[in-house]
């Protein structure tokens, strides 16, 4: 990008009205959402205080209509029925299986044969032989069960026009309301992170009008009983110690297949009911509680398992899940409902309020927005292209990660934490060839870095099992992880065909997140204690995995491009060859990351770093096919599926950094050709990945086109595989539901507005000025530990603000104009459209 002007800035400024500073518990200052009055002032009188709410005009008919809530560990989906209400309850450690050794003692022999066949360019036979490297399937994410509420028959006569159901993203509270005659009934639900319980309040406008029954149920082995003295129901249950068969026919009722109750994970859930004075609670048949003639009732739900880490057999666990639940319920006895709500709100908003986004460009009336269900708004997006719906989906991604991944929890899996099946699609397992990584793409730019902590805990567990897999399967040092994992930190290849199972780059891709975490936070202690050890072990494996090829370059052999076949020279389908473009791109990224990390930590003289630097010079370049696109494989094979959903060979552009518009324009041009060749259709996660790729190319038109593709309302009873879209609760569709695209969408929108390296900051690099002509984004994070706020009008930058927790030297770039700036801690900078500092103040 041409440099038209440059100047050095060494003072700090206050970003007036865009940035408010709060102090978090750890002492870090963070910008929060501006008050609505300030938002109005910033947009010259335009009211930007649109509610961030998902709204529904009736009860759920399908699970993908239900409202998700969560506190990172506990989750629920709320159906919002009138005469009966269902909450599907999830707890993030409810899984099948036990710790197991899935290493393959016969793998080294098979590996040698596969490599021989690849060397002979017999790729079809190598693909067949590579099945011998496959292993056992992962275990399966389960559901605790359902909480059922049955209201008296009068509720069936509710006034349909009075019904409203909503999820407020600013408070993380779900609400259901309706009227029966002259009585208004309301329910509120939230999942408290500070108190580790799910809380509901149900109330009626007329005293004594609230009566209902409540009970537990589960498809897993379970037993429930009431404790009338404490107004409680306790459910105990157990998970299967071994997953159901992979190919179990759908016609078979899985709940009837017996299993050993004692070997798998044990779980418990407790519900306690509080009622107003004058109301009563009694036991029905020892299984249900009955509430009669109350003004209001508060439900407190706790759930837990005896999971004690991925290396402890459930039978050896010292954790009593029922006792855990009792303790959690007991710990909140001192709090009123208002207290519980305030504690929840303070915890949640500390994270959520760090970023706000306001886009204008639509004539959609505010009143119409509030009266129209979210599903109808999605349906009409193709015609009105309402930017407030983009705001909503962006913030929904942040809401969902805050709700499904918190310090100390498990990672957000393929469905976050929300699941209603004992056989969920793709086992609900973490998939490491795009899906798990995409879950966390927006955690750093979206300014919720704490939510990424479970990923590094998980990687530490993978590193332990991965050392066994690397040593036994491949005779290599370090650690490795493949395509699919589970709560037991499985690292060996999955079952089945090599096209998906044989992919030893899952751990390496995850390791790039460790370096990214450092670049966004500049947390040297994290890098030293957690990030670098993970990179070190991964790098050791990669160095051993690389072998010298006939062309003199180091190569990976065998190698696949995730889930994609090619046509071998003999005309047969194959997936196994050598040095797929993604393999090499990930290795280049990891090697660059560990070299950079070694410089920060003073480890440049380590033997490992010397080996890495020597290997870097021997890695093959990214190659361009004869049609001008990026090659997916080392050879220019015929691609039988040019519109394949994966775009793995473009990793080097995004989320990687080895291809850039500025430094490698020829490769960037080839990436553009590749994206056009691949096409725009695909599942949700593919769509959002392509949006981020186009944004990295600074192509606002195509980035926005991919954004619009996500707004396609999906009928869960008539799904079309691989076509993406949104369900009515704004869960993203593969179909079926996968949560990755919810997170990928937030990352892609952030990428359209701000891009960065540790030395460069690009403002509005892919802004669709004709679609979002006016806007404010507040609180996005950039590499270098910089927080960014931007205001633009009529498609042009007006002003922006920067602040950092440490000294940062950066180059600010906007439309070819660049300026050098040095940010000082405790200061905030405000710049105008010409990148000149216009105001200054201390924090």
From Swiss-Prot:
Stated pH dependence? Optimum pH is 5.0.
Q: Which family does it belong to?
A: Belongs to the glycosyl hydrolase 95 family.
Top-tier EC class: hydrolase
* UniProt protein name: Alpha-L-fucosidase 2
Q: Tell me the InterPro entries matching this sequence.
A: 6-hairpin_glycosidase_sf (IPR008928), 6hp_glycosidase-like_sf (IPR012341), AFCA-like_C (IPR049053), Alpha-L-fucosidase (IPR016518), GH95_cat (IPR054363), GH95_N_dom (IPR027414)
SUPFAM superfamilies (UniProt xref): Six-hairpin glycosidases (SSF48208)
Q: Which organism is it from?
A: Arabidopsis thaliana (Mouse-ear cress)
UniProt signal peptide: 1-27
Spell out the Pfam families in the cross-references: Glyco_hyd_65N_2, Glyco_hydro_95_C, Glyco_hydro_95_cat
Summary of the function given for this chain in its UniProt record: Hydrolyzes alpha-1,2-linked fucose. Also active on fucosylated xyloglucan oligosaccharides. No activity with 3-fucosyllactose, p-nitrophenyl-alpha-I-fucopyranoside, lacto-N-fucopentaose II, lacto-N-fucopentaose III or alpha 1,6-fucosylated chitopentaose. Involved in apoplastic xyloglucan metabolism.
Claim: Chloroplast is one of the keywords in the record: no
Lineage: superkingdom:
Eukaryota
User: Per the record, GO CC terms?
Assistant: apoplast
Q: Which UniProt keywords apply?
A: Apoplast, Glycoprotein, Glycosidase, Hydrolase, Secreted, Signal
What tissue specificity does the UniProt entry give?
Ubiquitous. Highest expression in vascular tissues, leaf trichomes, root elongation zone and emerging lateral roots.
Q: Which GO terms describe its molecular function?
A: 1,2-alpha-L-fucosidase activity
Which sites does the entry annotate for glycosylation? 62, 253, 365, 605
Q: Which reaction does it catalyse?
A: an alpha-L-fucoside + H2O = L-fucose + an alcohol
Q: Which gene encodes it?
A: FUC95A
Null mutant phenotype: No visible phenotype. Higher abundance of fucosylated oligosaccharides and presence of unusual oligosaccharides.
Cystine links in this protein are none
- Which EC number(s) does UniProt give? 3.2.1.51
């Amino acid at each position: 990008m041409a440099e038209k002007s440059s100047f050095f800035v060494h003072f700090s400024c206050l970003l007036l009205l865009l940035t408010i500073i709060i102090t978090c518990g750890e002492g870090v200052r963070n910008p929060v959402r501006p008050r609505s009055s300030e938002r109005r002032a910033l947009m010259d009188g335009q009211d930007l205080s649109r509610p961030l709410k998902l709204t529904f005009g009736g009860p759920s008919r399908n699970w993908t209509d239900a409202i998700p809530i969560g506190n990172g560990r506990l989750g629920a989906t709320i159906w919002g029925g009138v005469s009966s209400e269902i909450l599907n309850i999830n707890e993030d450690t409810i899984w099948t299986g036990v710790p197991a050794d899935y290493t393959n003692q016969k793998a080294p022999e098979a590996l040698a044969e596969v490599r021989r066949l690849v060397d002979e360019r017999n790729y079809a036979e190598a693909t067949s032989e590579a099945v011998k490297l496959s292993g056992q399937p992962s275990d399966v994410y389960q559901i605790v069960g359902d909480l059922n509420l049955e209201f008296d028959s009068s509720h069936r006569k509710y006034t349909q026009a009075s019904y409203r159901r909503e999820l407020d993203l600013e408070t993380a509270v779900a609400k259901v309301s309706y009227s029966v005659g002259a009585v208004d009934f309301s329910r509120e639900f939230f999942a408290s992170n500070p108190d580790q319980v799910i809380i509901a309040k149900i109330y009626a406008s007329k005293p004594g009008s609230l009566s209902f029954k409540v009970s537990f149920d589960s498809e897993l082995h379970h037993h429930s009983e009431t404790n009338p003295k404490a107004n409680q129901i306790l459910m105990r249950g157990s998970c299967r110690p071994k997953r159901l068969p992979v190919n179990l026919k759908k016609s078979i009722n899985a709940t009837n297949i017996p299993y050993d109750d004692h070997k798998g994970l044990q779980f418990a859930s407790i519900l306690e009911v509080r009622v107003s004075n004058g109301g009563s609670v009694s036991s029905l048949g020892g299984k249900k509680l009955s509430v009669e003639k109350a003004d209001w009732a508060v439900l407190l739900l706790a759930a837990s398992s005896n999971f004690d880490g991925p290396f402890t057999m459930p039978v050896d666990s010292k954790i009593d899940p029922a006792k855990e639940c009792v303790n959690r319920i007991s710990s909140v006895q001192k709090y009123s409902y208002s207290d519980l709500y305030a504690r929840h709100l303070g915890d949640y908003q500390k994270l959520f309020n760090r970023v706000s986004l306001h886009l204008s460009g639509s004539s959609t009336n505010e009143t119409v927005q509030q009266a129209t269900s979210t599903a109808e708004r999605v349906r009409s997006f193709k015609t009105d292209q309402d930017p407030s719906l983009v705001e909503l989906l962006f913030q929904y991604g942040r809401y969902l990660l805050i709700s499904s991944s918190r310090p100390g929890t498990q990672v957000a899996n393929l469905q976050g934490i929300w699941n209603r099946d004992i056989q969920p699609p793709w086992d609900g397992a973490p998939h490491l060839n795009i899906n798990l990584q995409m879950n966390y793409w927006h955690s750093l730019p979206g300014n919720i870095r704490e939510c990424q902590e479970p990923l590094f805990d998980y990687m530490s567990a993978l590193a332990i099992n991965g050392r066994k897999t690397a040593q036994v399967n491949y005779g290599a040092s370090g650690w490795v992880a493949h395509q699919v994992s589970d709560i037991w930190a499985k690292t060996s290849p999955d079952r089945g065909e090599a096209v998906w199972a044989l992919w030893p780059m899952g751990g390496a891709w995850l390791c790039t997140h460790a370096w990214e975490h450092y670049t966004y936070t500049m947390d040297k202690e994290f890098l030293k204690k957690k990030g670098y050890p993970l990179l070190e072990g991964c790098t050791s494996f990669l160095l051993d995995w690389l072998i010298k090829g006939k062309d003199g370059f180091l190569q990976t052999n065998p190698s696949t491009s995730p889930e994609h076949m090619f046509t071998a020279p003999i005309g047969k389908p194959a997936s196994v060859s050598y040095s797929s473009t993604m393999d090499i791109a990930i290795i280049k990224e990891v090697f660059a990351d560990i070299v950079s990390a070694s410089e920060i930590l003073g480890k440049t003289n380590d033997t490992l770093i010397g080996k890495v630097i020597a290997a870097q010079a021997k890695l093959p370049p990214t190659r361009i096919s004869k049609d001008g696109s990026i090659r997916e494989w080392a050879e220019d094979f015929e691609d039988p599926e040019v519109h394949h959903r994966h775009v793995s060979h473009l990793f080097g552009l995004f989320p990687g950094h080895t291809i850039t518009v500025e430094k490698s324009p020829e490769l960037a041009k080839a990436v553009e050709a590749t994206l056009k060749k691949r096409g725009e259709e695909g599942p949700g996660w593919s769509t959002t990945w392509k949006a981020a790729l186009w944004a990295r190319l600074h192509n606002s038109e195509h980035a926005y086109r991919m954004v619009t593709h996500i707004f396609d309302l999906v009928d869960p009873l008539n799904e079309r595989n691989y076509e993406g879209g949104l369900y009515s609760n704004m869960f993203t569709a593969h179909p079926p539901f996968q949560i990755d695209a919810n997170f990928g969408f937030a990352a892609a929108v952030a990428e359209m507005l701000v891009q960065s390296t540790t030395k460069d900051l690009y403002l509005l690099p892919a802004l669709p000025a004709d679609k979002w002509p006016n806007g404010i984004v507040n609180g996005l994070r950039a590499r270098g530990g910089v927080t960014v706020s931007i205001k633009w009008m009529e498609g042009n930058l007006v002003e922006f603000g920067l602040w950092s927790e440490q000294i940062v030297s950066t180059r600010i770039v906007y439309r070819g104009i660049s300026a050098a700036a040095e940010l000082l801690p405790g200061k905030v900078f405000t710049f105008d459209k010409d990148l000149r500092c216009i105001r200054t103040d201390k924090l």
